[in-house]
Swiss-Prot record:
<feature type="domain" description="Peptidase S8">
    <location>
        <begin position="125"/>
        <end position="397"/>
    </location>
</feature>
<feature type="glycosylation site" description="N-linked (GlcNAc...) asparagine">
    <location>
        <position position="150"/>
    </location>
</feature>
<keyword id="KW-0865">Zymogen</keyword>
<feature type="glycosylation site" description="N-linked (GlcNAc...) asparagine">
    <location>
        <position position="305"/>
    </location>
</feature>
<keyword id="KW-0732">Signal</keyword>
<dbReference type="InterPro" id="IPR037045">
    <property type="entry name" value="S8pro/Inhibitor_I9_sf"/>
</dbReference>
<keyword id="KW-0325">Glycoprotein</keyword>
<feature type="signal peptide">
    <location>
        <begin position="1"/>
        <end position="19"/>
    </location>
</feature>
<dbReference type="InterPro" id="IPR015500">
    <property type="entry name" value="Peptidase_S8_subtilisin-rel"/>
</dbReference>
<keyword id="KW-0645">Protease</keyword>
<keyword id="KW-0843">Virulence</keyword>
<feature type="domain" description="Inhibitor I9">
    <location>
        <begin position="35"/>
        <end position="115"/>
    </location>
</feature>
<dbReference type="InterPro" id="IPR034193">
    <property type="entry name" value="PCSK9_ProteinaseK-like"/>
</dbReference>
<dbReference type="Pfam" id="PF00082">
    <property type="entry name" value="Peptidase_S8"/>
</dbReference>
<feature type="glycosylation site" description="N-linked (GlcNAc...) asparagine">
    <location>
        <position position="123"/>
    </location>
</feature>
<feature type="propeptide">
    <location>
        <begin position="20"/>
        <end position="116"/>
    </location>
</feature>
<dbReference type="InterPro" id="IPR050131">
    <property type="entry name" value="Peptidase_S8_subtilisin-like"/>
</dbReference>
Length: 397
């Protein structure tokens, strides 16, 4: 049964004379009247604070000067490793003033964000064996880089069942920016977390696990909620001294978004290795975010026979393939289940990336390059202009 599907949203760039860029989209997936505003590089914290005060005054003034539908105004502000932005609902006059402000780089609509996978109840598991052997059809998992001791995994997803016994007491609830239901209703986040850090199905078997819920019980979110979750995770890691010792998996996406790409890249630069799913639309990954950001490790899905899964996105932005078809992992309430998708492939890279980062003392932005050096050139029928590199953990097996 299909749970959710990545949306493909094409957008057109409009120019405003002597103003910031307005990145516009077609109506599909756009949340009417809701926007993300990104500041120019080099804007100071003081200038950002002054801009926010100006914005609040402009919003009140424009609402008061005529009869107009109410808009709530500012909802969130972010500073992710110097990337400063905010979101909110604004009327057209306020948006025009924002575009004309000297410190604004661009504005884009807030839009829906979803994850992608299918679930099948079948008794099969093979992913860990494949990524720890150069030859296919092995049946054991071999690792020479440990089990993720002293690492922390942040799952940006539908939430994680922190009481799942396979997490052996290592999981904690971080934040819920999606709804008011502090559980993983759909299982997607618990499944991806199990591949990264579960005892039975995971790679970082001794890592700490943190749930960051950005998708609601229908598997829906938006770019504002996503960036809110990302921002919280960076601040949590900084507060706890975990930067440089943390990994993050992002098995969700939306149409190509400059704001989503920039925020995610800055999060990695702050000190967290990030693995992202390429998407399940069987199209070029350049059309989706955050997988279209070349600085991130974008992961396509492979099959048991070392081919590209029929649903997986492809193209020059793919860094690695990893097992993504019929992957068994954890589900809420101490259950297990099989899911397929690039959502299932990316967690394999997240886990191995954490091991390599810790073992070799790499910066997060160096990890993907190292994984590609270790990778196994095994993928057949990868797709046009797409790598043949399959994730390998360097075990020597």
């Amino acid at each position: 049964m299909s749970i959710f599907k990545l949306m493909v949203i094409y957008f057109t760039l409009f120019w405003v004379v002597n103003a910031a860029q307005l990145l516009d989209l077609d109506s599909h997936g756009v949340i009417p009247g809701a926007y993300i505003v990104v500041m120019k590089n080099g804007v100071s914290s003081h200038q950002f604070s002054s801009h926010v005060r100006w914005l609040k005054r402009a919003h009140r003034r424009n609402l008061a000067k005529r009869v107009a539908p109410f808009t709530e105004g500012l909802s969130s502000t972010w500073d992710i490793a110097g990337w400063q932005a905010y979101s909110g609902s604004f009327d057209k006059d306020t948006i025009q003033e924002i575009l004309n402000h000297e410190n604004v780089e661009f504005v884009e609509p807030n839009r829906e964000m979803k994850a992608a996978s299918t679930i099948k109840q079948e008794n099969i598991t093979w992913g860990l064996a494949r990524i720890s052997h150069m030859e296919n059809f092995s049946h054991d998992y071999v690792s020479t880089y440990g089990e993720g001791e002293n690492l922390t995994f942040y799952g940006i997803d539908s939430g994680i069942d922190i009481h799942q016994s396979d997490f052996t007491g290592r999981a904690r609830w971080g934040i819920n920016v999606a709804d008011h239901i502090d559980i993983d209703c759909i299982g997607h986040g618990t499944h991806t977390a199990g591949t990264v850090a579960g005892q039975s199905f995971g790679i970082l078997k001794k890592a700490s696990i943190v749930s960051v819920k950005v998708l609601d019980c229908y598997g829906h979110g938006d770019t504002t909620k996503y960036i809110n979750g990302l921002n919280w995770a960076i601040n949590d890691a900084k507060k706890r001294g975990l930067l440089g010792k943390s990994v993050m998996n992002i098995s969700l996406g939306t149409g190509r978004s400059r704001a989503v790409n920039e925020a995610t890249v800055r999060a990695q630069e702050a000190g967290i290795f990030i693995s992202v799913a390429a998407g399940n639309n069987a199209i070029n990954a350049e059309f989706l975010s955050p997988g279209s950001a070349p600085e991130l490790c974008t992961v396509a899905a492979s099959t048991r026979n070392d081919t590209r899964a029929y649903f997986s996105n492809y193209g020059a932005l793919i860094d690695l393939f990893a097992p993504g078809e019929y992957i068994r992992s954890t589900l809420p309430h101490n259950r297990t289940g099989i899911m397929s998708g690039t959502s299932m492939a990316a967690p394999h890279v997240c886990g191995i990336g954490g091991l390599i980062m810790a073992a070799e003392g790499l910066a997060p932005e160096q990890v993907c390059r190292r994984l590609k050096e270790l990778a196994n050139p095994a993928i057949k029928y990868a797709g046009f202009n797409t790598t043949d590199k399959l994730l390998y953990n360097g075990s020597g097996a």
